[in-house]
């Protein structure tokens, strides 16, 4: 009996999978391909599917991590002998574990060093030690932006967040980015404060941000979708332009049977399926990509050269290489194509 029940459950599962597979609008790639096909079909034209160019991947970690300058050994030895809390901070750094600090722990160390050295400076009376402390604090403050960069864009977890191996951003989903967006906003405020040399900030949440980056891959999915949608909208726009150049859809602005079919597809597929996905991408860009772009831009002074080209492609909102600027241009051009097509028949929305 259990075998029969298992067989029925398996059959039901297969039916569900088959039905899902028959719905081209359940995922971004088949949805956009189907859309281009239907545009061609209703306009009696054969669409040409352009190749989606390979995305520029995030530079390898070794090309993102900046070398962290160290204090002179003599200065560290001197400070480690002085009887205030700073000797313990220096001692931890000189330990075996301290020599292989991960970027976030290194940032915590740098902040703690500056704070502790400042506290020591208020209590010390020896002029020589005062001079050493002031020099150490100045050096650490100067190199703090490097530690901040390494703890944001120099971590392995960033590669998972931006991986392209997880396909496109899902269709018809809600609230996928709330945690990532909240993290990005909080991280930006903290980094901005640190760059202003305000060290009275909480770094305790930072590790959780990295954990979420390691578990999520939404930024990479969004970039995949932006590239896919821009290319496929361009394909559909070319079909429209070809029809407009070859022969009118309507004569004397009067609708006909074909224009009714075109209008029906416009509302059912473009307005009903594609536009909601475009709205999802715009929201996701605002919620996640824009704060991440800000996180990189505010650290432009230390941004590695290898990272800059990738930033211009994946995170920048403007520029020839920006996937987001290209998406905006594709949407604008496609909208104008629909307007020109429907206007021939007096069917332009809002007219």
Task: List each language-model region with its residue ranges.
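A cross-kingdom marker for long, charged
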Residues: 25-51, 217-351
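Detector for Asparagine
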Residues: 23, 63, 94, 105, ...
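C-terminal motif of bacterial Sec signal peptides marking the signal peptidase cleavage site
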Residues: 18-21
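Extended, low-hydrophobicity segments enriched in charged/polar residues
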Residues: 136-245
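N-terminal Sec/ER secretory leader and immediately downstream segment
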Residues: 25-179
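Bacterial N-terminal signal peptides that target proteins for export
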Residues: 2-11
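Polar/charged alpha-helical tracts
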Residues: 5, 33, 37, 41, ...
């Amino acid at each position: 009996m259990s075998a029969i029940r298992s067989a029925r459950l398996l059959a039901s599962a297969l039916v569900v999978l088959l039905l899902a597979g028959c719905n081209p609008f359940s995922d971004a790639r088949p949805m956009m391909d189907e859309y281009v096909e239907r545009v061609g079909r209703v306009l009696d034209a054969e669409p040409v599917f352009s190749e989606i160019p390979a995305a520029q991947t995030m530079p390898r970690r070794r090309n993102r991590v900046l070398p962290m300058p160290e204090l002179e050994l003599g200065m560290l030895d001197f400070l480690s002998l002085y009887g205030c809390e700073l000797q313990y901070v220096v001692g931890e750094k000189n330990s075996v574990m301290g020599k292989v600090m991960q970027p976030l722990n290194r940032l915590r160390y740098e902040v703690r060093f500056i704070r502790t050295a400042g506290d020591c400076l208020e209590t010390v009376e020896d002029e020589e030690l005062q001079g050493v402390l002031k020099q150490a604090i100045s050096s650490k403050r100067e190199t703090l932006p490097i530690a901040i960069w390494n703890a944001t864009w120099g971590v392995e977890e960033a590669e998972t967040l931006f991986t392209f191996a997880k396909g496109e951003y899902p269709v018809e989903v809600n609230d996928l980015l709330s945690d990532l967006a909240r993290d990005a906003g909080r991280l930006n405020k903290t980094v901005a404060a640190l760059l202003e040399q305000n060290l009275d900030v909480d770094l305790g949440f930072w590790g959780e941000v990295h954990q979420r980056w390691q578990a999520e891959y939404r930024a990479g999915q969004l970039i995949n979708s932006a590239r896919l949608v821009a290319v496929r909208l361009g394909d559909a726009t070319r079909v429209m332009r070809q029809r407009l150049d070859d022969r009118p859809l309507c004569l004397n602005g009067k609708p006909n049977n074909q224009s009714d079919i075109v209008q029906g597809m416009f509302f059912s597929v473009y307005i009903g399926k594609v536009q909601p996905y475009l709205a999802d991408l715009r929201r996701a860009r605002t919620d996640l990509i824009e704060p991440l772009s800000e996180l990189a831009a505010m650290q432009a002074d230390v941004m590695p050269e290898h990272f800059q080209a990738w930033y211009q492609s994946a995170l920048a909102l403007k520029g020839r290489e920006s996937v987001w600027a290209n998406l905006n241009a594709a949407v604008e051009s496609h909208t104008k194509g629909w307007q020109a097509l429907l206007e021939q028949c007096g069917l332009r929305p809002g007219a």
